[in-house]
UniProtKB/Swiss-Prot annotation:
SMART domains: WD40. This is Coatomer subunit alpha. Changing residue 164 to V: In RNA edited version. Oligomeric complex that consists of at least the alpha, beta, beta', gamma, delta, epsilon and zeta subunits. Interacts with SCYL1. Interacts with JAGN1. Interacts with TMEM41B. Interacts with SVEP1. Probably interacts with PEX11A. WD repeats lie at residues 3-38, 42-80, 84-122, 126-164, 195-234, 241-278, 282-319. The modification Phosphothreonine is found at residues 185, 591. It comes from Homo sapiens. Keywords: Cytoplasm, Cytoplasmic vesicle, Disease variant, ER-Golgi transport, Golgi apparatus, Hormone, Membrane, Methylation, Phosphoprotein, Protein transport, Repeat, Secreted, Transport, WD repeat. Changing residue 230 to N: In AIAISD; causes a defect in retrograde transport from the Golgi to the endoplasmic reticulum. The gene is COPA. It is a peripheral membrane protein. The coatomer is a cytosolic protein complex that binds to dilysine motifs and reversibly associates with Golgi non-clathrin-coated vesicles, which further mediate biosynthetic protein transport from the ER, via the Golgi up to the trans Golgi network. Coatomer complex is required for budding from Golgi membranes, and is essential for the retrograde Golgi-to-ER transport of dilysine-tagged proteins. Xenin stimulates exocrine pancreatic secretion. It inhibits pentagastrin-stimulated secretion of acid, to induce exocrine pancreatic secretion and to affect small and large intestinal motility. In the gut, xenin interacts with the neurotensin receptor.
Length: 1224
């Protein structure tokens, strides 16, 4: 059972599917009727007029009507479009159990606890017939789907079949019916002869709750309180019981025939739904609920859907999945239909059956895996109990007879899923969830241990995708290892693109699109179930939900292409065609409009010519495209879609197109628009539009200030007059201040009663007459004349030297693709093209270099774009002043043609930009980046400051090798020298200014070179090994690493190299020493002992300890020799070495003394001086190499390090820097 939809509500007593729309009506025990969309899983409407439980409910087949009957004795007819009850039919005297529409006539059939069945005419709104005869509650009554029959079930333990052909004949003259009914108002309980009982079916031992006709056969099914489901057959003369289905252990509430299969469904108060095989009369499936009793069942008239109502709501379900099993390879589709494997050629549309499948499984094929190399298929079948799942391996016959195809012998085995992994191997996930690899004979070739998984999918040759509860893992079957994984729960289907570069992972409500390495590119959530998908050749994923065909681009953009009536399963997408299978396994081709996703794809891939073509020719409309373009940063493109002025205005502002914004603002004439336009125009320095905006919004203060800063005194005076007319004293005075008009200020102050201020203003500014006349107006008794400040300074606004008449000059930026091309559609389109053609000459670098300047350096008046400048001299070109003869100094006498012809004018080359190598140096403090840029001097300085390098001779070869990798070279034109490319390691986000060079040397390369050094050490080539270790050590400062772990690994690499170089140097020096005297022999033993304290690999440590052991044993220093023997045995040497060591150890332990005193204390930690090869015990002063960390006695400070041969011992440095992280 596949649950498609579930609701939680009061007890559901009635259910009805809409014949066409994905709707279902539920009538509840609390009096509410609910209308649900089971595909979208939403409640559409509620109808609440009944008083008490509603038991009967039914949709009309054609009209927007449904009927309901309740415990309030009322039958109500509703119009769901108008969302109201149209009328109520009264007549029943007790609860109404069921109500059904007739499939043809305007009749409603109702069954009631008043022991009658009534037929109503919903057009005339009257009762046309009463069927009496039952002597207990009538629990159910239904029309026959094609004949004039009614079946009813009653608690009187009978099922009755009624013949209503008399009613139908009578119904042809409606008047007769009405008069008849009116004439029997007193005795209508006893009915008329319009309907007669044809058969009475007795056989149930208790009350019958439900009876229903078979849609096509003369059969009736009934369910009763005796816990039995009975099947009855009838003919014209009689009806009889055929069989009984036993299994329910409580009252059977409802029983229906499956509309298209030989099945019966029943449900019961025992909290179960049971499916019975009609031919075998046995139970096929049982579905149980824990706490809810079932009350009603409904079958969809056209689809394989059922609904069941229970105590806590209802469920819509299918008995089995309807998804066809199919596999696509190239132009071929293989799919399973009616126990045949069929093959469809997409190109020729030829559809043939190639093979008959063996029968036996009662479950449909779950999925299919096709092997084109061997022309073989794997068909997997899922049982309700997963452990019983099987798969079949078939080889498709070469020359199949399409009319009567063969049924080749298939190989069947148990397993959840089988998938091809190679030409002749397939993987099986068995019931224990382990992976088996089998060959074409279905024999196991090997078992593979895999991480916990419950499903497997194909992932290319040798690879599988493994599904667990919350992720998908890419698994290499050959190497038996996990390659990658991505988080997504319960993936159902996996669809690879044709080139296997992308994969779509489909879950119930989600799609994750990943690349080949399983890096998630985008995650899409859907509210409706995702059904299927296929990749378009352009790299767009086309997928279907229950009700839409949609697209998804790998960047995450997705949208709807078209709506679907019924779910389909996409098999292939090519051009405008979507090839698919429907639920009846019929191949179909749907046409789609790919414009929207092609448009978005072109934008994402920056194919602007395609975008422009679509803008001009395609019917791309709608707010979503505009919003998309705006969101993605293409407002200038969106501008050409928009007709709405408000949207045009906001888009124009966003892309800085003041002209279009001004047009839109004029059309809208809204204060807010003018204010916004003013702000943007001000930012661009377009003060003429700013002035217009301030005038439109009457923003006089800002307008005055604009005139002040542009030096437009004439208009400022007008503003002062306007302020005076408006009686705006403050504005009037402010404008007078801006203008520096003292007499006006005195007048304003005098008029507004500020005599003291007016007097001070006049007197301070030397307006003596005015001051005197004001002085006389003061009353000496009441008013004091204010004192004039003798130190007053004149505050006067500066006089404008050059009033700004034109707008602020803007840089000529290169127009975007769209602005340039779309602008050329307008008036100057052809002209623009001509000018471009004419001016692409040798001087094409800069027309702006030809401005004529006057002696003050300003543009001459003729350079403006006034009418006079354009009007004259157009024929001769005189307005450009390029024909004038200038007297040039003789040294500038250049031969004609040298600069591209006399008429070309003076050419100013563009200023040189910063070279990529200089950018590298500017952006990085890592030495290797400076070496790659060729800046050896700065690289040396960095190495000196960071790790103390003072001797650069050994670095010469490394520098040159590294620099050689810093650039690529390629031939452009045959006549030109080679061009250089400068590859960046951060090329994805480098831009023009943030690049840093690609580095050839990797940490892993050095680690691999370390293995060679170990081999040289093992075979005893010490001097060669020391050279190789030193080469690695010197290369470490020339690395670039990305994380802290790699920094730590690099420092560990330095430590390893130091330990080996010091130790091997000690050993080399020891071997050179003479052995004549006792002192010389003691020195040899000391150096061998020191070597055992180097931190070496165990294999080398064994060799070192064996050497020291032999030397000390010969010197008769048995006590020390015993310690070396014990250390040697702890390392686990070979058996023969261990045996000899134990012999020496036992000899030493018999006499545990040292014959001679040596400068070696094994119990006191020490470092070896890398110059003198003597121990520096802990606590003694020590100097270190800043790069390798090698230890030296203080007397060696300032000398060259013996380990690195390039650094200064004891130098104070910043420290090793090989990652940008170390500078944060």
């Amino acid at each position: 059972m596949l649950t498609k939809f579930e609701t939680k509500s009061a007890r559901v007593k009635g259910l009805s599917f809409h014949p066409k729309r994905p709707w279902i009506l539920t009538s509840l025990h609390n009096g509410v009727i609910q209308l649900w969309d089971y595909r979208m899983c939403t409640l559409i409407d509620k109808f609440d007029e009944h008083d008490g439980p509603v038991r009967g409910i039914d949709f009309h087949k054609q009209q927007p009507l449904f009927v309901s009957g309740g415990d309030d004795y009322k039958i109500k007819v509703w119009n769901y479009k108008l969302r109201r009850c149209l009328f109520t039919l009264l007549g029943h005297l007790d609860y109404i159990r069921t109500t059904f529409f007739h499939h043809e006539y305007p009749w409603i059939l109702s069954a009631s606890d008043d022991q009658t069945i009534r037929v109503w005419n919903w057009q005339s709104r009257t009762c046309v017939c009463v069927l009496t005869g039952h002597n207990h509650y009538v629990m159910c009554a239904q029309f026959h789907p094609t004949e004039d029959l009614v079946v009813s079930a009653s608690l009187d333990q009978t099922v009755r079949v009624w013949d209503i052909s008399g009613l139908r004949k009578k119904n042809l003259s409606p008047g007769a019916v009405e008069s008849d009914v009116r004439g029997i108002t007193g005795v209508d309980l006893f009915g008329t002869t319009d309907a007669v009982v044809k058969h009475v079916l007795e056989g149930h031992d208790r009350g019958v709750n439900w009876a229903a006709f078979h849609p096509t056969m003369p059969l009736i099914v009934s369910g009763a309180d005796d816990r039995q489901v009975k099947i009855w057959r009838m003919n014209e003369s009689k009806a009889w019981e055929v069989d009984t289905c036993r299994g329910h252990y409580n009252n059977v509430s409802c029983a229906v025939f499956h509309p298209r299969q030989e099945l019966i469904l029943s449900n019961s108060e025992d909290k179960s739904i049971r499916v019975w095989d009609m031919s075998k009369r046995t139970g096929v499936q049982t579905f149980r609920r824990d706490h809810d009793r079932f009350w009603v069942l409904a079958a969809h008239p056209n689809l394989n859907l059922f609904a069941a109502g229970h105590d806590g709501g209802m469920i819509v379900f299918k008995l089995e999945r309807e998804r066809p099993a199919y596999a696509v390879h190239g132009n071929m589709l293989h799919y399973v239909k009616d126990r045949f494997l069929r093959q469809l050629d997409f190109n020729s549309s030829k559809d043939v059956a190639v093979m008959q499948l063996r029968s036996g499984s009662k479950f449909p094929v779950f999925n299919m895996s096709y092997n084109p190399a061997e022309n073989a298929v794997l068909l997997c079948t899922r049982a309700s109990n997963l452990e019983n799942s099987t798969y079949d391996l078939y080889t498709i016959p070469k020359d199949a007879d399409s009319q009567n195809p063969d049924a080749p012998e298939g190989k069947r085995s148990s397993g959840l899923t089988a998938v091809w992994v190679a030409r002749n191997r397939f993987a099986v996930l068995d019931r224990m969830h382990s992976l088996l690899i089998k060959n074409l004979k279905n024999e196991i070739t090997k078992k593979v241990q895999v991480p916990n998984c419950d499903e497997i999918f194909y992932a290319g040759t040798g690879n599988l995708l493994l599904r667990d509860a919350d992720s998908i893992t890419l698994f290499d079957v050959q190497q038996k290892r996990t390659l990658a994984s991505v988080k997504i729960s319960k993936v159902k289907y996996v669809i690879w693109s044709a080139d296997m570069s992308h994969v779509a992972l489909l879950a119930k409500h989600a799609i994750v699109i990943c690349n080949r390495k399983l890096d998630a590119l985008c995650n899409i959530h859907e509210n409706i179930r995702v059904k299927s998908g296929a990749w378009d050749e352009s790299g767009v994923f086309i997928y279907t939900t229950s009700n839409h065909i949609k697209y998804a681009v790998t960047t995450g953009d997705h949208g709807i292409i078209r709506t679907l009536d019924l779910p389909i399963y996409v098999t292939r997408v090519k051009g405008n065609n979507v090839y698919c299978l429907d639920r009846e396994c019929r191949p179909r081709v749907l046409t789609i409009d790919p414009t929207e996703f092609k448009f978005k794809l072109a934008l994402i891939n920056r194919k602007y010519d395609e975008v422009l073509h679509m803008v001009r020719n395609a019917k791309l409309v709608g707010q979503s495209i505009i919003a998309y373009l705006q969101k993605k940063g293409y407002p200038e493109v969106a501008l050409h879609f928009v007709k709405d002025e408000k949207t045009r205005f906001s888009l124009a502002l966003e892309c800085g197109n003041i002209e279009i914004a001004l047009e839109a603002a004029k059309a809208l004439d809204d204060k807010n628009c003018w204010e916004k336009l003013g702000e943007v125009a001000l930012l661009q320095g377009n003060h003429q539009i700013v002035e217009m905006c301030y005038q439109r919004t009457k923003n006089f203060d800002k307008l005055s200030f604009l005139y002040l800063i542009t030096g437009n005194l004439e208009k400022l005076r007008k503003m002062m007059k306007i302020a005076e007319i408006r009686k705006d004293m403050s504005g009037h005075y402010q404008n007078a201040l801006y203008l520096g008009d003292v007499s006006e200020r005195v007048r304003i102050l005098k008029n507004c009663g500020q005599k003291s201020l007016a007097y001070l203003t006049a007197a301070t500014h030397g307006l003596d007459e005015e001051a005197e006349s004001l002085k006389e107006t003061f009353d000496p008794e009441k008013e004091t004349i204010p004192d004039i400040d003798p130190n007053a300074k004149l505050l006067q606004p500066p006089a404008p030297i050059m009033p700004l008449d034109t707008n602020w000059p803007l840089l000529t930026v290169s127009k975007g693709f769209f602005e340039g091309t779309i602008a050329s559609k307008g008036k100057g389109g052809a002209l623009a093209a001509d000018i471009d053609i004419d001016t692409v000459g040798t001087e094409g670098w800069g027309e702006d270099a030809e401005l004529q300047l006057d002696e003050d350096g300003f543009v001459e008046a003729t350079e403006g774009l006034g009418d006079d400048a354009l009007g004259k001299g157009q024929e001769e070109g005189g307005g450009w002043d390029v024909e004038e003869d200038l007297e040039l100094p003789p040294e500038l006498d250049i031969s004609p043609g040298a600069a591209g012809g006399a008429e070309d004018g003076f050419f100013v080359p563009p200023t040189k930009g910063t070279s990529p190598t200089q950018i590298w140096c500017n952006n990085s403090q890592l030495p290797v980046d400076h070496i790659l840029a060729g800046s050896f001097e700065t690289a040396m300085r960095l190495l000196h400051d960071q790790v103390g390098v003072i001797q650069f001779g050994p670095y010469k070869q490394l520098f040159l090798q590294t620099y050689a990798r810093g650039r690529t070279t390629y031939q452009a034109l045959p006549c030109l020298p080679s061009m250089y490319g400068y590859p960046n390691r951060n090329w994805k986000d480098a831009g023009l200014k943030n690049g840093v060079p690609a580095v050839g040397l990797k940490l892993n390369d050095l680690i691999q070179r370390l293995q060679l050094c170990y081999q040289l050490t093992t075979v005893g080539k010490f001097e060669e090994a020391v050279e190789k270790f030193r080469s690695i050590l010197l290369s470490v400062p020339l690395l670039v690493v990305d994380n802290k772990q790699e920094i730590a690994e690099a420092q560990q690499l330095i430590t390893i190299c130091r330990e080996y170089i010091v130790g091997l140097s000690v050993e080399t020096e020891r071997k050179k020493l003479p052995k004549e005297t006792l002192e010389q022999q003691k020195r040899i033993c000391e150096m061998a002992a020191y070597f055992t304290h180097s931190n070496l690999q165990p294999v080398h440590m064994i060799l070192v300890l064996r050497t020291a052991l032999n030397l000390f044993f010969k010197l008769k220093n048995f006590k020390t020799a015993a310690t070396f023997a014990r250390r040697l045995l702890e390392l686990g040497p070979k058996p023969e070495v261990a045996q000899q060591t134990r012999k020496i150890l036992s000899a030493c332990e018999k006499n545990p003394t040292d014959a001679y005193q040596l400068n070696y204390d094994m119990h006191n930690p020490f470092d070896i001086c890398a110059a003198s090869y003597r121990p520096i015990y802990r606590g003694k002063p020590v100097e270190k190499c800043p790069l390798s960390g090698a230890c030296y006695s203080p007397e060696f400070k300032g000398q060259i390090c013996r380990v690195t041969t390039v650094t200064e011992i004891g130098k104070d440095v910043i420290g090793l820097r090989i990652s940008p992280l170390q500078f944060r």
